[in-house]
Amino acid sequence: MKPPSFDYVVADSVEHALRLLADGGDDAKIIAGGQSLVPLLNFRMSRPSLLVDINRVPGLANIRKSDQTIAIGALTRHAKLTTSKTISQNLPILSEAAAWIAHPQIRNRGTIGGSLAHADAAAELPVVLLALDAYVTAQSLQGERKIPLKELLVSHFVSSILPGELIVEVNVPQLPHGSGAAFDEFSRRHGDYAIGGAASIVTLDEQGKCSRARITVLGGGSTAIRCQEAENILIDSTLSSHDIAAAAHAAVQGLDPVPTVHGSAQYRAQVIRTMVERTLAKALHRARPTKESMDH
């Protein structure tokens, strides 16, 4: 299928893009990599009258590290997340997840800002960034908003970004010392949409017990989901195999996986449970060397 007709304008600055968005109102859309938007256009699920191309806007593809956060420009390509030393050294789970996204051609074009703005329930980055307690910085002609991921992701292809707003940056708090994190997913073939996936982060205290946990899942409903009851099971535990199994069981309670040609809801829930177990075990393994290096 082919998209409906639309006007196309290339913005040369953030302010220019914001003026174009304000003038276009509900009928204006941002385009960068087009990973999510172009399929929606082709299937006529989205019918904007104006596309604002931000690929030439300077300063939106930078990655900056501060004492407390990593700031990632909204135009940062998925491929850059897999190769950036700043990301691999400070947020390796983000590099790990980005490598799962589709195929190299798409990773070379798709952007972190676009992935979040479109809130595709099948996307990897929202799941990981939700686990990382990330927030986005969105700008409009009226000012700036900081939006936590838990408030940004509303439903499948529905985010809380308002007409006239542009995501300019993704801000990720640095993990506490003694933390380990992991992402994994299962699909029929690499590059296909995942049947199920999970991101897990654990932090160990001086006694080797879990002081902090984050578990988020992919494929469990209409958006990325945080499993707080499962996290609570792990707090003050030694993260034994029994603890991990109990948390994985709790994580899939109350999920609402959508059955597809690739698997029933029950099958997808089982896949998610396995991914939670697997990522928790990996996160624990990665947290232990971090903790041990602190003690020497």
Curated annotation (Swiss-Prot):
Disulfide linkage: none
Keyword DNA-binding applies: no
Assigned keywords, A-Z: FAD, Flavoprotein, Oxidoreductase, Plasmid
GO BP terms, alphabetized: nicotine catabolic process
Tagged with keyword Disulfide bond: no
Record SUPFAM superfamilies: CO dehydrogenase flavoprotein C-terminal domain-like (SSF55447), FAD-binding/transporter-associated domain-like (SSF56176)
Gene3D superfamilies, alphabetized: 3.30.465.10, CO dehydrogenase flavoprotein, C-terminal domain, Uridine Diphospho-n-acetylenolpyruvylglucosamine Reductase, domain 2
Entry's cofactor comment: Binds 1 FAD per subunit.
MF terms in GO: 6-hydroxypseudooxynicotine dehydrogenase activity; FAD binding
Domain FAD-binding PCMH-type: 1-177
Cross-referenced InterPro entries: CO_DH_flav_C (IPR005107), CO_DH_flav_C_dom_sf (IPR036683), Diverse_Substr_Oxidored (IPR051312), FAD-bd_PCMH (IPR016166), FAD-bd_PCMH-like_sf (IPR036318), FAD-bd_PCMH_sub1 (IPR016167), FAD-bd_PCMH_sub2 (IPR016169), Mopterin_DH_FAD-bd (IPR002346)
Enzyme Commission number, as recorded: 1.5.99.14
Swiss-Prot/TrEMBL catalytic activity: 6-hydroxypseudooxynicotine + A + H2O = 2,6-dihydroxypseudooxynicotine + AH2
Pathway assigned to this chain's UniProt record: Alkaloid degradation; nicotine degradation
Enzyme class: oxidoreductase
Pfam families per UniProt: CO_deh_flav_C, FAD_binding_5
Binding site for FAD: I30, I31, A32, G33, G34, Q35, S36, L37, T111, I112, G113, G114, S115, E124
Cofactor dependency: FAD
Subunit record text: Heterohexamer of 2 alpha (kdhA), 2 beta (kdhB) and 2 gamma (kdhC) subunit. Dimer of heterotrimers.
Role description: Molybdo-flavoprotein enzyme complex involved in nicotine degradation. The subunit gamma (large subunit) contains the substrate-binding sites, the subunit alpha (medium subunit) binds FAD and the subunit beta (small subunit) has a 2Fe-2S ferredoxin-type domain which binds 2 2Fe-2S clusters.
Name of protein: 6-hydroxypseudooxynicotine dehydrogenase complex subunit alpha
Gene source species: Paenarthrobacter nicotinovorans
Classification lineage: Bacteria, Bacillati, Actinomycetota, Actinomycetes, Micrococcales
Gene: kdhA
